Amino acid sequence: MLAEGRQVYLPPPPPSKLPRLSGTDPTDGVVTMAAPSPLVLGLGLGLGGSGSDSSGSDAEASAATVREARPPSALTFMQRQELEQQVLIYRYFAAGAPVPVHLVLPIWKSIAAASSFGPQSFPSLTGLGSLCFDYRSSMEPEPGRCRRTDGKKWRCSRDVVPGHKYCERHVHRGRGRSRKPMEASAAVAPTYLPVRPALHTVATLATSAPSLSHLGFSSASKVLLAHTTTGTTRAT
């Protein structure tokens, strides 16, 4: 056989196998199996003659048949995106977490655009800015799971506290806390008491009354009155 000007030798096909069953007659129970066809790669190199072309066309025909038998997708690309968004909203509902505004906003816009009353009839979300969009929450596959991680692969498996991003164990972590318990210090404000004469001063003046006549006081009561007046003046 010639292929592209060169003679290529193909080995002859193997002989047919004749398995025999045990019996008296050697011709009884002879089963003749068809010899296998020679190997055809179908690489388009000219080996195998027209067989390669026919095998290639058969493969293309079978692939076309598979494509025709496969049912077309029932959803478009936009419909699949909307379905994924609704599934994500349902996960937030199931976890008891608040749904981010940017997930609800496209639904609100589609309803407002399809309504005959116009967007003015739905003022609840009118005027929302970009601050209401939480893009990190939109990429969260498990919104009800605690977000505490070690920065690598580990992540806490507990459920979040409603209204927070972390579980009960990690919700207060990271806040500035004192290691020592705070004790209430009872600060006593300084009080100013009026100056009063001591009792021993009165007793001393009373016992020394006879010897005070040379100082110009006629009695001990006058001396006590003068001492009290002087102490009050100093206090003021």
Curated annotation (Swiss-Prot):
Residue stretches making up the QLQ domain: 74-109
Cellular compartments per GO CC: nucleus
GO MF terms, alphabetically ordered: ATP binding
The keyword Transcription is assigned to this record: yes
Region Disordered, residue ranges: 1-27
Record's subcellular location: Nucleus
Keywords, comma-separated and alphabetical: Activator, Nucleus, Transcription, Transcription regulation
Name this polypeptide is given: Growth-regulating factor 12
Annotated motif Bipartite nuclear localization signal, positions: 145-155, 173-180
Similarity comment: Belongs to the GRF family.
InterPro entries registered for this protein in UniProt: Gln-Leu-Gln_QLQ, GRF, WRC_dom
Source organism (scientific name): Oryza sativa subsp. japonica
PANTHER family in the cross-refs: GROWTH-REGULATING FACTOR 5 (PTHR31602), GROWTH-REGULATING FACTOR 9 (PTHR31602:SF81)
Positions of the WRC domain: 140-184
Function: Transcription activator that plays a regulatory role in gibberellin-induced stem elongation.
Annotated GO biological process: developmental process; DNA-templated transcription; regulation of DNA-templated transcription
Domain of life, source organism: Eukaryota
Domain free text: The QLQ domain and WRC domain may be involved in protein-protein interaction and DNA-binding, respectively.
